[in-house]
């Protein structure tokens, strides 16, 4: 039975030097609990790119998946915007 509610994130490709793998940086805004100021919190995840179609600077959508390797738990779904 497949789980339907998998996480989807949008981020920017910051590295494409590995084969079939891209590093995606996800930037989120979180509010500080005391000072009520919004902070930019970023994290970098490795995502599987089977066809090696994304390039450095592309805006991509990734989805959570089964573990593909030691650090890869995300797959590339689509490229939302190409880099210039």
Curated annotation (Swiss-Prot):
Name of this protein: Small ribosomal subunit protein uS17
Pfam family, one: Ribosomal_S17
Organism, scientific name: Borrelia duttonii (strain Ly)
UniProt GO BP: translation
GO molecular function: rRNA binding; structural constituent of ribosome
SUPFAM superfamilies on file: Nucleic acid-binding proteins (SSF50249)
Sorted UniProt keywords: Ribonucleoprotein, Ribosomal protein, RNA-binding, rRNA-binding
Top-level division of the source organism's lineage: Bacteria
One GO cellular component term noted in the UniProt record for this chain: cytosolic small ribosomal subunit
Family the entry assigns: Belongs to the universal ribosomal protein uS17 family.
CDD domains for this protein: Ribosomal_uS17 (cd00364)
Assembly description: Part of the 30S ribosomal subunit.
Functional note: One of the primary rRNA binding proteins, it binds specifically to the 5'-end of 16S ribosomal RNA.
NCBIfam families referenced in this protein's UniProt entry, alphabetically: PRK05610.1, uS17_bact
